[in-house]
């Protein structure tokens, strides 16, 4: 998901000197395309393109055209049209990475203005993390997830789900070790996770690769999941 909340400029143009005129807000949005990789049911790494467009001004619709000219309407939106994105189905993933190059976004704002944006996708992708362990401690009051570090990943984030409900979310974090550790882990008190009661919990670990060290636009993400009974 990436929903890129890039802080774009919002200009307030004051008309007249009396202060009685109405202010106009300049329409501006940020658009991002990035590669998402997962392992399918057969254990094969597959890829798709994720599109995310954000604006402080409500948008009516967003469409994107790939470097090869294929159009796609972004039908998922949140916050009254401040964010548009695509939710890929299993059939949208392929063993071949998405086409690199410039993706063109046509953004239609609620006031009728239409603006075109572009974002370029490189060829880099991330492998899904190899989760080596997900288990409760001997005392039974904590749970640890362990995984092999993903080559080239800038950071990670973790989401814990119980069915369709989010039980816990760990925002992006990075390994600050020098040198970087080959294996990583996160631990949680059980009472941090089990607000939805006992049952099957899904840990969703995502690796993040940004376009640059300004850490705003994404180039690629990868997601691995594993279940545990809590």
Model-derived segments and spans:
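Edge beta-strands of extracellular beta-sandwich domains
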Residues: 113-122, 213-226
């Amino acid at each position: 998901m990436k929903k890129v909340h890039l802080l774009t400029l919002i200009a307030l143009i004051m008309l007249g000197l009396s202060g009685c005129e109405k202010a106009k807000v300049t329409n501006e949005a940020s658009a991002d395309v990035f590669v998402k990789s997962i392992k399918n049911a057969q254990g094969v790494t597959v890829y798709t393109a994720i599109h995310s467009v954000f604006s402080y001004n409500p948008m009516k619709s967003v469409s994107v055209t790939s470097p090869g000219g294929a159009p796609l309407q972004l039908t998922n939106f949140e916050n009254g049209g401040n964010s548009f994105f695509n939710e890929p189905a299993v059939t949208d993933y392929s063993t071949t990475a998405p086409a690199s190059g410039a993706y063109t976004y046509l953004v239609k704002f609620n006031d009728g203005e239409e603006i075109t944006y572009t974002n370029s996708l490189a060829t880099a992708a991330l492998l899904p993390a190899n989760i080596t362990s997900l288990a409760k401690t001997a005392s039974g009051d904590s749970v640890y997830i362990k995984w092999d570090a993903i080559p080239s990943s800038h950071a990670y984030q973790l989401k814990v789900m119980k069915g369709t409900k989010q039980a816990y979310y760990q925002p992006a974090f990075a390994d600050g070790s020098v040198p970087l550790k080959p294996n990583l882990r996160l631990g949680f008190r059980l009472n941090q996770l089990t607000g939805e009661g006992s049952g099957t919990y899904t840990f969703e670990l995502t690796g993040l690769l940004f376009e640059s060290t300004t850490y705003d636009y994404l180039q690629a993400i990868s997601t691995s999941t594993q279940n545990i009974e809590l």
